[in-house]
Each structure stands twice: as structure tokens, then as C-alpha cells.
UniProtKB/Swiss-Prot annotation:
GO biological processes: mannose metabolic process; oligosaccharide catabolic process
Native source organism of the sequence: Halalkalibacterium halodurans (strain ATCC BAA-125 / DSM 18197 / FERM 7344 / JCM 9153 / C-125)
Sequence intervals crossing the membrane: none
Active-site residues (renumbered): 125 (nucleophile)
Co-factor binding comment: Binds 1 divalent metal cation per subunit.
Function: May hydrolyze 6-phospho-mannosyl-D-glycerate to mannose-6-phosphate and glycerate.
Gene designation: mngB
InterPro entries in alphabetical order: Gal_mutarotase_sf_dom, GH38_beta-1, GH38_C, Glyco_hydro/deAcase_b/a-brl, Glyco_hydro_38_C, Glyco_hydro_38_cen, Glyco_hydro_38_cen_sf, Glyco_hydro_38_N
GO molecular function, one term: carbohydrate binding
Protein name (Swiss-Prot/TrEMBL): Putative mannosylglycerate hydrolase
Length: 896
């Protein structure tokens, strides 16, 4: 059969990487100008693939808005191919819902520009891909995925080498854990195998002999794929002339300036009946381990933590809150703006922390804009909701507190909020005297009561005097000073999405009931609640006794420091091989807080480590020595690193909260926290995208890298069959299982980008204050059988508390939009539909068996099963529906 060579012109566009965004944008404008001219002058130049993303159009049209009609025309003609993504994201370091928003807004852009062509799941350079990608794509009607990494190893020089784990063909079947399948197209010869095609006959002869042979080696059909482009590659203007030369030299091959639509149509007609099936995540599991790029999970951890905060704000607070307000279009517009701004930080070279320092400084500003904007929006919209509620109380002195519950699950937790007991505005008296006047006020005793619950346990502390201001919608700003209280209360709610009003009521009688403090004997360095007992040791490590099982987890929280002579992409241990730990430290321990609802202990340790790598590392960096071949050790000069660890135990909590502050004074090193689980079994679990995946503790025999690090989203869990320990983190995405211990990376300090040149990155050393937050959750059995992952997902999402005035609003004291049940199911989305006509709820089932989902809502007329793109599939019922959620299935319901 005659071979067909499909030549697809493209440019893989890293929006920011070895230059800042604006530097790369200059060349994007050149590329697009040249491309539009080529479309106009060369009718044989059929199409150009815009790297699977739509943000490139925004970046271009912001500079050249007059080109929009021309761009739109070529998109509608099928010559300029965009989407389906808004940006080419890193798959593992962005949340499940962020991956879906990326697809939603990308598809919306393609429809806005009038693109009619079917989409492909495009992952040309993604640093590994989550296992549920086939299910997500299939639910969006996308039946093929193109990817360059994850099955065969890829080096920093962007060359892919064949490996037995990959399919023998470029074409394969990729299956998600739930059984969903897509056709997988492996870019086995990388996304530049047809780059810069010669027009000179002699050069073309040499070029095509090699390229055709390489492509035929992996092709299961007569259709051969050649990607005519590479990173930031200018469009090849004479590619159609080069094709004519090739046709003359190789008459037995049909050379075609093509696109993915035509290529996929052709190969589907010829695919063999039996293709290799690859199931689940693609992480280079069976390679030598040196080119996985997994340690981007720990480069510049501060970026990952900011991203986690922003994703949580948008997914778990701002979007659900939209369903409680009248002006849903305002919410929808702000939500899209904040999501798109946040996703500017989600390309792999951005969120992975593997770019030059200037790129990541700009990222910090974007995160700050999203966080500040979303926080303001939530606060102001919360005030508008609160102003509509009936907040009258028998006592005129009662302070109404509206609790907005937006996480979509019921449950109990300890809530902390600052309340203005008394405000004095600057227009009421001379501002210079206000603080003293406020300090004279005697703080009364308070109780907190809810109309449907009565009084709840509460702790109140004087928080002093604070400056603030109001911004009335119909007037000039009003500055004030306020006397504040810090109110901590136990909140047990059966709300899923809604609000209820509580009242902070002053009472004359003093508290007489004795409340048991969580630290009974301060000299014993022990915290204890109903579920666990925490014993702190002299070296600063601690043990947890799970009171429900009687199992003790010993010597948790020892810190380990080793040299790192790698780069932003990959960790490489220094050649000295020395581990420095806090095991022999003498820690200082002090109580920060101790009451009936919450206790916090601070542990302070000093660890002496080498100040940097030795001078050999500089030489190896300058000579571009590949990281596995480096031999540098650590310097003789020493420096002290101060670690401050806060352990917090709350009433009723099943987990111990840990906050670590590292004052980093060293370079070229990695610091981890160690959590042993005695007699751990050979596999463990980690949170991924719509999946809790099971992974082996030890690598495949082909693995040569001494380190076997992994990605996680929210949690990692290790058990011994009877008892387990789950660690739920906030923005910590790297771990390793080492000798029956979970090692969580808290800090990684390196000084260069890596890859194809020498790009120094001194800010990637992360000097100064570094924070890490996580929760330790002991349990019986494994993480799935114990359902402990539900608490892990819920931990970052706190209720929003709004202080308001007493008023006779039209809304009742409490409202709940829906309720649901389904043991072990995880709710990931609670948002307005993109078209503004209803509500979207999404769950996934992490378990290996099916589960019934029951949903009730009296606020909507119809309930539909929906695609991931929020399109109706079938009507399920009205107020009450029950469906079966298959093992590891993602389910989306649409309410109208």
C-alpha cells in the first residue's frame, strides 16, 4: 500500500519559559503575522495547528486587534486550528476541576471563533498525564489523544527513545480506570520529526530517507505523521515547496500538507483490530527514571501553594456562592475572568516552576491578583446575601454572623473568625482618641446560638483594636477603628450549599461550666481529643495514638536534608551521600494555644547543614553536564536552618494539623518530612485527577535513578493492611516511599533551570521563610476502605463567615439548595452552568466498586445527567433522583 506522509505545520508555544511572557509574545506576533500572510498568499498551505490552545489568540489579538476578522475567517475555513484547551496545562499540578475549566473555556473560545472541526486531546509535551484523561476526553466527545511523553522516556534535549513499555506502534488504545477509551497517538519521534523540511534535493533526500524510516518503525498503518514545527518555531514559509520536492524524490509516498482531522480519519480506516492497550496514568513508569521531570512537583513550592489557595477559592467558594445570589451574570463574568487569569499560571513551564526567575515573579503577581480579587468578591457578595436575610434577634446587642456553607458536604469542624464588637467611625469623633476609647470597653461574656441548634461550644479571645474601612455603594469611604474579638466555635452543619444565621449574644453570667482543655498537663507535651493522643518527643518528633484502633504511629515528623545538584526539572542527590536529620536535635517546645476547642504547640529546632554545593557544581552547570552525570558534593561551610513546627489539634478532629516554617539559609538541597508506618505493604495510594491511584513503593527493574519520587494532588496514604496513615497537603505535590516511610518534600533549592542551555535561577533557591501545611489522618485499613480521603478533600474548605447588622430581610434564617448521599463519593464541583440556566454538581467514585448516589433538591425543576461540558444527556427526574456510579466513574448532573 502506498504510504501517505501527513505533514502538520505547528509551533509548540510555551507562553513563558526561558524568556518572560512579553519576550516570547514578541515572537508570537511575528509568527502570527507571517502565518496570516502565508494563508493569504499560498493556497497550498492548507492549515496550521495552534498547539491545542486558544490563549495564543488572546495574546496576539491584544496587540493586533485589527486582525480579528482575518483570524476568525481562517478558523472558520478550517485552516487555523485551535483548542480544545484554553492553555496547555501541566496535568498533575493543576486540580481536577482546573483541568475541566481549561477544557470548558477552551471549547467556549473555539465555538466563539466559529471552529467546526472535531477536537483532539492534545498533550504534546505534558510532563506525564493523569489516568482519567481518556474518561474526561470521552465525556467531552473527544475520541483521540495525542501525546509525546509518559510512555517512552524523553530527555532534556527533546528526543524520545523507544522503550518496551510503549506500544510497538504510534497508535494505541488508552483506557481510563473506569474503562473509557480513546485512540492514543504517541509522538514516538517527538513533535518536531518533520521540522525544517529541506527544499534542496540532496538535503531533502537525506532528510526523508531517515524520517520515513523512523516513522515507519512505529506506524501500524500506511499513514505517517510528521510534525512540522518545534518549540517557538517560526512557520516554515516554503513548506509547500518542500513537499513538491519530496514528491519528486519519493513517488511511492503521497506527501500531504495535512491536519489532525484528516490524519485521524485516514488511520481509523486502517487500524489493526488488535492494538496495545495502555491503562491509567502515563508517568514513564518503566524507564531508567532520569527524565521523568517529576521533581518539577517540588520546584518553587510557593507557587504550588498559591495555586492551591486560588483553586480552592474559585472552586469551593466563589462558584458555589454564585448559586445563592440574584445577579448570576456578574458572578459568571468574574468567575471566567479569575479562572482565565489563574490558568495563565497553569502551563507546565509556569506552574512547574521550571522557568527563569522573571517568569515566576510575574506568576506571583497573577496569583495575588486572583486571590485578592476573589477574596474581595466573595466578601462583598457575602455581605449582599447577608443583607437579604432576616437577622433580627430578641437582644439588640446580639451580633448576627451569617455562615455560608459552600463545600457541598455536611459535617463538623472548628471555625475561627474575627468579629468587630464595636466600631467607631472617624466621622463620629477625633480619630486620634478612638483607640483609647475602644480599649476602655469591658469585654462581656458571649454565647453563640443558632435558631435551629441552640448554643454551640465557643471560645472568645480579645483581639485588640484594628483599623478598617467601609466602602458604601452609594457614598464615600468610611474609615474606622474596631475593637475585635477572635471567636472560635464548633460548627456542626447539615447544610450542603447554603447559609444559616447565628448570633453572638452577650450574657451577664460568667461561664461556670468547666471545659476540658486539649492539653491537660502542659509539662507532659501531650495533646489529646476524642480521637487521638499526640505525644511530642525531646527531639521534636511526635507519636500519634489512634484511640479508635489503639495503633500508635511512632516518631513522626523527623526532618531530612540532602544535597541537590540537579535543576528545576530533576532532583539529583549530591555525591557525598550524607543525610542530615533532626533525629538527634534538642527541640524547644512551647504552648501557643490551649482551650476546649483547639490546642497548638510550637516545636523549634535548628539543623546544621552545608551552606551550598561545592565548587564543582558551578563547573558542571557551565559545561551543561546532564544531571545524572554530575559528581558535585556539598561545601565544607555550614549554615543553620531553623524549623518551627506548629501542631494543632481541634475538638472532634480526626486529623492532626501541622504547619512547618523553614527559614532557609542554604543552597542546593532538599528537605523532607518523614512519616513511618510500621510493616508497610508494597503498594500505596495517592490522589490524582479524579482518581485515588494505587502505585508500587519500589520501581520497575529498568529504573536506574536512586530516587523514586511521585506526584500527588491532595493526599498520599501508606498502610500495612491493618492500619494506615494518610497525609493531606495544601500545595505540596511531591513524595517518595522510603523504607516504610512517607517522605514529603517541603523545600527544594536549586540554582538553574536545566534543559537545553545555562539559565541561572537564584530565586529557585527559595531563601528565607518557607511554609508547609498538611494534616495527618490515622485510620484503620487503607485510605479507600476507611473513607478517610473525604476528610482530606474537605480540609482546605472552611465556611465563610459574614458579620452583618440586624435587619428584617426577606430571606429565612437558613437555606440549603440541595443534599446528597453516596458513601465514599467525592463532590468536586458545585457551580452555575456556563449558560447561566442552572446548577452543575460533579462527583467521582474513587473506589473499585459501584456506589448509589441519591440527590435531592427542591430549588430546581429538572435534573439531567450531563457531559463534562455541561450538555444534557438524559433526564433523570425532578426533585429526587438516584443513580449508580460505576467504579472510578466521573458523574456530572445538571439542574434546571
Amino acid at each position: 500500500m502506498k504510504k501517505t506522509a501527513h505533514i502538520i505545520s505547528h509551533s509548540h508555544w510555551d507562553r513563558e519559559w526561558y524568556m518572560p511572557f512579553e519576550g516570547h509574545r514578541y515572537y508570537l506576533i511575528q509568527l502570527m503575522d507571517d502565518l496570516l500572510e502565508l494563508f493569504a498568499t499560498d493556497p497550498n498551505f492548507r492549515s496550521f495547528h495552534m498547539d491545542g490552545q486558544t490563549i495564543m489568540l488572546e495574546d496576539y489579538l491584544n496587540i493586533r486587534p485589527e486582525k480579528e476578522a482575518e483570524v476568525r475567517k481562517y478558523i472558520q475555513d478550517g485552516r487555523l486550528v485551535i483548542g480544545p484547551w484554553y492553555i496547555l496545562q501541566d496535568a498533575f499540578l493543576t486540580s481536577a476541576e482546573a483541568n475541566v475549566r481549561n477544557l470548558l473555556y477552551g471549547i467556549k473560545d473555539t465555538e466563539t471563533f466559529g471552529q467546526k472541526r472535531e477536537q483532539i486531546g492534545y498533550f504534546p509535551d505534558t510532563f506525564g498525564i493523569y489516568g482519567q484523561a481518556p474518561q474526561l476526553l470521552a465525556q467531552a466527545g473527544i475520541r483521540a489523544a495525542v501525546f509525546g511523553r509518559g510512555v517512552t522516556p524523553t530527555g532534556f534535549n527533546n528526543q524520545v527513545q523507544h522503550d518496551d513499555y510503549s506500544s510497538p506502534f504510534s497508535e494505541l488504545i488508552w483506557e481510563a480506570p473506569d474503562g473509557s477509551q480513546v485512540i492514543g497517538i504517541l509522538l514516538a519521534n517527538w513533535y518536531s520529526n518533520g521540522n525544517e523540511i529541506p527544499t534542496d534535493e540532496d538535503e531533502a533526500q537525506t532528510f526523508w530517507v531517515k524520517k520515513l524510516r523512523d516513522a515507519e518503525r512505529f506506524a501500524s498503518t500506511s499513514q505517517l505523521l510528521f510534525m512540522n514545527g518545534c518549540d517557538h518555531q517560526p512557520v516554515q514559509k516554503d513548506v509547500t515547496q518542500a513537499i513538491k520536492v519530496a514528491e519528486t524524490l519519493f513517488p511511492d509516498v503521497a506527501f500531504k500538507h495535512s491536519n489532525f482531522h484528516d490524519y485521524l480519519t485516514q488511520i481509523k480506516e486502517e487500524l489493526p483490530k488488535e492494538l496495545q492497550k495502555i491503562t491509567g496514568e502515563l508517568r514513564n513508569q518503566k524507564t531508567d527514571g532520569w527524565s521523568t521531570l517529576v521533581n518539577t512537583a517540588s520546584a518553587r513550592i510557593y507557587l504550588k501553594q498559591a495555586n492551591d489557595r486560588c483553586q480552592t477559592l474559585l472552586t469551593n467558594v466563589l462558584e458555589p456562592m454564585c448559586l445563592l445570589v440574584e445577579n448570576k451574570s456578574l458572578h459568571r463574568d468574574f468567575s471566567e475572568y479569575y479562572w482565565k487569569l489563574l490558568m495563565e499560571n497553569h502551563p507546565h513551564d509556569s506552574i512547574c516552576g521550571c522557568s527563569i526567575d522573571a517568569v515566576h515573579r510575574e506568576m506571583k503577581t497573577r496569583f495575588e491578583k486572583v486571590e485578592a480579587g476573589a477574596t474581595t468578591f466573595i466578601a462583598e457578595q457575602g455581605k449582599e446575601i447577608a443583607a437579604q436575610i432576616n437577622t433580627l434577634h430578641d437582644s439588640e446587642e446580639a451580633i448576627p454572623l451569617v455562615v455560608l456553607k459552600t463545600n457541598g458536604t455536611s459535617g463538623k469542624r472548628v471555625v475561627r473568625h474575627k468579629v468587630a464588637m464595636k466600631k467607631i467611625y472617624f466621622d463620629e469623633m477625633d480619630f486620634r482618641h478612638i483607640p483609647d476609647r475602644l480599649k476602655e470597653i469591658v469585654m462581656p461574656t458571649y454565647r453563640l446560638e443558632f435558631p435551629n441548634k441552640g448554643s454551640v461550644p465557643i471560645e472568645v479571645q480579645d483581639a485588640g483594636v484594628r483599623f478598617g474601612y467601609d466602602l458604601p455603594r452609594d457614598g464615600f469611604r468610611r474609615p474606622y477603628y474596631a475593637r475585635e474579638l477572635e471567636v472560635t466555635f464548633s460548627y456542626d452543619s447539615d447544610l450542603y450549599l447554603g447559609y444559616e444565621c447565628g448570633f453572638l449574644v452577650p450574657v451577664e453570667e460568667k461561664q461556670t461550666e468547666a471545659r476540658k482543655e486539649l492539653i491537660g498537663d502542659p509539662s507532659m507535651n501531650t495533646l489529646e481529643n476524642e480521637a487521638m493522643k499526640v505525644m511530642i518527643h525531646r527531639n521534636g518528633s511526635y507519636s500519634i495514638l489512634d484511640k479508635t484502633t489503639g495503633f500508635e504511629y511512632r516518631h513522626l515528623g523527623i526532618y531530612e536534608d540532602v544535597g541537590d545538584i540537579g535543576n528545576e526539572y530533576m532532583f539529583k542527590a549530591s555525591s557525598d551521600g550524607v543525610r542530615y536529620t533532626t533525629e538527634a536535635c534538642e527541640a524547644s517546645i512551647r504552648i501557643i494555644e490551649n482551650n476546649s476547642l483547639c490546642a497548638t504547640v510550637e516545636i523549634c529546632q535548628t539543623l546544621s547543614v552545608p551552606a551550598a554545593a561545592d565548587e564543582r557544581l558551578k563547573e558542571e552547570q557551565e559545561r551543561l553536564v546532564w544531571h545524572p552525570d554530575r559528581k558535585a558534593g556539598r561545601s565544607k561551610e555550614r549554615t543553620d536552618i531553623t524549623l518551627r513546627t506548629e501542631l494543632t489539634l481541634e475538638q472532634g478532629a480526626k486529623g492532626l494539623k501541622v504547619n512547618v516554617n523553614i527559614d532557609n539559609t542554604a543552597k542546593d538541597h532538599r528537605m523532607r518530612a518523614l512519616f513511618p508506618v510500621e510493616r508497610a505493604r508494597g503498594n500505596h495510594y495517592a490522589d490524582s485527577i479524579y482518581e485515588i491511584v494505587e502505585r508500587p513503593n519500589t520501581p520497575d527493574p529498568k529504573w536506574q535513578n536512586p530516587a523514586f519520587d511521585h506526584h500527588m494532588q491532595r493526599l498520599v496514604s501508606l498502610d500495612n493492611g491493618e492500619y494506615g496513615l494518610t497525609i493531606a497537603t495544601k500545595g505540596l505535590h511531591e513524595y517518595e516511599i522510603v523504607s516504610d516511610s512517607i517522605a514529603v518534600t517541603l523545600l527544594r533549592s536549586v540554582g538553574e533551570l536545566g534543559d537545553w542551555g545555562l539559565f541561572e535561577t537564584p530565586e529557585a533557591q527559595c531563601f528565607g521563610q518557607n511554609e508547609a501545611q498538611f494534616v495527618l489522618l490515622p485510620h484503620k485499613g487503607d485510605v479507600l476502605s476507611a473513607n478517610v480521603y473525604v476528610a482530606a478533600y474537605d480540609d482546605p474548605v472552611e465556611p465563610t463567615v459574614i458579620q452583618t447588622e440586624q435587619s428584617m430581610g426577606p430571606l429565612p434564617h437558613a437555606t440549603n439548595l440541595f443534599q446528597w448521599s453516596g458513601e465514599g463519593l467525592v463532590l468536586t464541583a458545585c457551580k452555575p452552568t456556563m449558560d447561566g440556566r442552572g446548577m452543575i454538581l460533579r462527583w467521582f467514585n474513587p473506589k473499585r466498586e459501584g456506589e448509589a448516589l441519591i440527590v435531592q433538591s427542591t430549588h430546581f425543576l429538572q435534573i439531567y445527567r450531563s457531559t463534562i461540558l455541561e450538555e444534557q444527556i438524559e433526564k433523570l427526574g425532578t426533585e429526587n433522583v438516584q443513580i449508580e456510579v460505576r467504579p472510578q466513574e466521573i458523574v456530572t448532573l445538571r439542574f434546571e
